[in-house]
Every structure is written in structure tokens, then in C-alpha cells.
Amino acid sequence: MNSNFTRAEIKAQAKEQLRGKVWMFFLVNVIVYAILIPISFLTEMENAASIIGLIAMYVVTPPLSLGMIMVYLDVTYGDPVEISTLFKGFKMLGKSIALFLWMLLFILLWSCLFIIPGIIKSYSYSMAWYILAENPDMTAREALTESKIIMNGHKLDFFVLQLSFFWWAMLIIVTLGIAAIYVSPYQQLTFTNFYHNIKRQPAPVAEEVYAEPVYTEPVADVIE
């Protein structure tokens, strides 16, 4: 892995951070599902309720996702974790929805060329949620641009890191989902540590093959 820490070290760090917090994350997930499941039921209806449910899903899911990222960031920083952090994403409602829609749009557009460019773009933008959570003054487009910068040269690293959870995913299936109580936060903390790891590194000199022809805002001095 072309980074300061190996995959094994990043995952070991995540396990240590998760120690004593498994049930806290379980509670956070229960709250999230308690909000999203009723909304998903609305989308299955065949009347106006389905439209309301669909709108609610697109309005509620992005800020909740951002709030979850904030919870994981707090844990990796060693900060006290509060359930209320889960709802801090709603303070950035507009930006979280904008980030979700821009990501969806760009990935769909690149997927129209071929599937592979769309997959590559999804990895380019995969750190945007973390960036927006840590930089609330950024716009959604700026977070996407910053994600492209720090993921340049690290997309394969992230893919391999995700692949390293294959057997954990099998364990979830074998245990009928019970193992997810541990595996899910362990995986997400690992990905959060990956973000911390690559954001400290200078961007590689090589340019990406694909780039949007729009948005020309300068990218100097954006890497910590």
C-alpha cells in the first residue's frame, strides 16, 4: 500500500478505536434504520405517499450519512462521542444533498461512457463526505475536487482495502447479519483511518486520465 501505514496497521488501529464502542455504534445504526425504514416503506406505496417517501429519502439520507461520518471522525480523533453528532449533518442539509446529487450525476455521466470510468469516478469521489464533514465551509463541488486530489494514486489502495474485508462479509452472511454489529463499524473506522492517512500525503505528480471539463477553481494549498 503506497502510504504511511500498511493495511494491517490501519485495520489494527480501527480495532483498537472500536474497543468498548461496539454497542454505541449499534445504537447509532438502530437510530438510523429507525428513521430510514419507515421512509422506505412509503416509497413502496402506489399513491402520493410514494412520491413523498422518495423526496424524504433524498432529503434525509445525505445529512444522516454526513452525520455518521462525523461520528466516525470523532472516534478516530479520540473525541467524546455523542449520539447528537449523528444529527449534525442536518446543519449542512443543503451541502449534503448537493454533494449526494453531484456525485450521483458525475458517476452516472461517466458510467454512460463505460462501466469502468464510472467505477473509477466513484473511487475518486469516495473521500468527499469526510472532506465536507471536516471542512463545513467548503462547497460540495470543492469537496469533490479535493477528494479527486487526495485519491489520485490511491484508488487501487482503497479498492484493495475494501477487498480485504471479503471474508468479514462472508461472516456476516453466515451469521445472518449478526456479525455486522462488529464488522460494520470496524470497516467504517478502517476507511476513516485510510482517509486520515492519505490526506497527509502530497498528491502524486501524475494527472488523472478523466476529469470534468468544468470547474477550474485552483487547487493549490488545499492539501494538509
Predicted regions: what is each one?
Residues 1-224:
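Hydrophobic alpha-helical membrane segments
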